[in-house]
């Protein structure tokens, strides 16, 4: 079969890597891909912001399965369009992708269906923000309503800062059109958890849990990013908690979306805060997370194609997945200045030596390749990932590999999974 992956990041490299292991895949394409993906799939040019451009690639490939990596093509309606043309596509429709595309839609949906989440207010002007802040205690979370590549969330330490951040969002200077409306939220305390399920519109099958590290600096300091690393182990949550999350969060979401006429098929990513009051929803993503996909897929031992097709065909079951008991970790190596302004075009050295470390796979994110050498081409450059029988060994392998990679301005967090190893 012919499989097309849409996207160009570390998540897409991990998807390509896992799909390539399937004996059912005869030809693998990625559009647009990146320098590292080009070694494992045929890369095709595409503008992921333009639905016509994506459809043109579909017409060129005529895929038996399309896997959509990033959120933007989903919100443009790529699954609707491909399905209409008879090209099976994995992911939610444009209507169902509103769960991620609009923070205000998601919050109101959660309230309608009595799914636990933080108290909030939806505002469309600085005046509304100042009035709403009277009902909050600092710190306050300020979220841009629309898609902002993981950078539309700010934890304001004071109400004055919250009002200032909201004003910046409204102005369009901070996150463009994504900030025309903002959501204010109570700042929850606890450990964050990424809980992903596969859905066929009615049933769900949970994937193994993962924990992301959003802040750019060690000790969870500095601004939010798209994610600086993640890990996955058997012990993140027990079976009892997993079942609770399925029955009290994932299933009610899928059932609620169907009841509202927007059947949800694909991956539902529940970003949760495990608080003293119980798990609460921070956000939804309608696709595989990045960098969580990298450690999750390193633990997957069954055929990913079978599971994705089950979602499309309406026959998802937990038996679709077989998982390793090993631990896995991904450490993101980023360009100097990220998540702010950064330079690209820096030559990357040491990739072969890093990949030779036992249990390590280096996933490419922001890279390009020319004349046989790799160069930086984005903020998050590489996802250095490792699998081992226990978390400490996986972390040691990943950092040993990181130390072998060199490019001008490279930086990465030195404490991925550190809190988990202290428990």
Put a short name on every predicted segment.
Residues 92-152:
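A conserved helix-loop-beta module that forms one wall/lid of the active-site cleft
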Residues 43-49, 121-125, 156:
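Short acidic-hydrophobic, aromatic-tinged amphipathic segments that line or gate anion-handling sites
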């Amino acid at each position: 079969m012919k499989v097309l992956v849409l996207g160009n990041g570390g998540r897409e490299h991990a998807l390509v890597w896992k799909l390539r292991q399937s004996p059912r895949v005869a030809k693998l394409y990625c559009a647009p891909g990146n320098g590292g993906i080009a070694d494992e799939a045929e890369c095709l040019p595409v503008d992921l912001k333009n639905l016509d451009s994506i459809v043109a690639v579909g017409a060129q490939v005529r895929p038996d399965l399309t896997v959509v990596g990033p959120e933007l093509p989903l919100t443009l309606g790529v699954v609707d369009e491909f399905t209409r043309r008879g090209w099976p596509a994995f992911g939610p429709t444009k209507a169902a992708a509103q769960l991620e595309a609009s923070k205000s839609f998601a919050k109101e949906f959660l309230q309608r269906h009595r799914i636990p989440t933080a108290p909030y207010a939806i505002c469309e002007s600085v005046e509304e923000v100042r009035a709403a802040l009277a009902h909050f205690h600092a710190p306050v979370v300020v979220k841009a309503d629309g898609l902002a590549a993981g950078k539309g969330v700010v934890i304001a330490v004071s109400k004055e800062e919250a009002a200032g951040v909201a004003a910046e969002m409204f102005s369009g200077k901070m996150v463009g059109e994504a900030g025309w409306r903002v959501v204010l939220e109570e700042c929850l305390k606890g450990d964050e958890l990424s809980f992903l399920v596969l859905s066929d519109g009615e049933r769900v099958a949970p994937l193994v849990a993962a924990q992301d590290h959003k802040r750019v600096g060690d000790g969870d300091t500095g601004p939010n990013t798209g994610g600086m690393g993640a890990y996955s182990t058997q012990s993140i949550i027990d079976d009892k908690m997993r079942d609770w999350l399925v029955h009290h969060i994932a299933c009610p979401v899928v059932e609620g979306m169907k009841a509202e006429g927007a059947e949800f098929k694909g991956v539902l990513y529940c970003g949760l805060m495990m608080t003293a009051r119980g798990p609460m929803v921070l956000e939804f993503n309608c696709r595989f997370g990045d960098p969580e996909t990298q450690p999750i897929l390193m633990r997957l031992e069954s055929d990913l194609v079978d599971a994705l097709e089950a979602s499309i065909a309406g026959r998802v079951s937990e038996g679709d997945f077989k998982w390793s008991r090993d631990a896995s970790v991904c450490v993101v190596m980023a360009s100097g200045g990220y998540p702010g302004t950064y330079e690209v075009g820096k030559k990357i050295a040491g990739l072969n030596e890093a990949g030779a470390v036992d249990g390590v796979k280096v996933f490419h994110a922001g890279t390009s390749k020319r004349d046989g050498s790799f160069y930086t081409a984005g903020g998050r450059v590489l996802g250095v990932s490792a699998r081992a029988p226990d978390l400490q060994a996986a972390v040691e392998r990943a950092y040993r590999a990181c130390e072998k990679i060199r490019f001008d301005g490279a930086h990465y967090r030195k404490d991925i999974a550190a809190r988990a190893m202290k428990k």
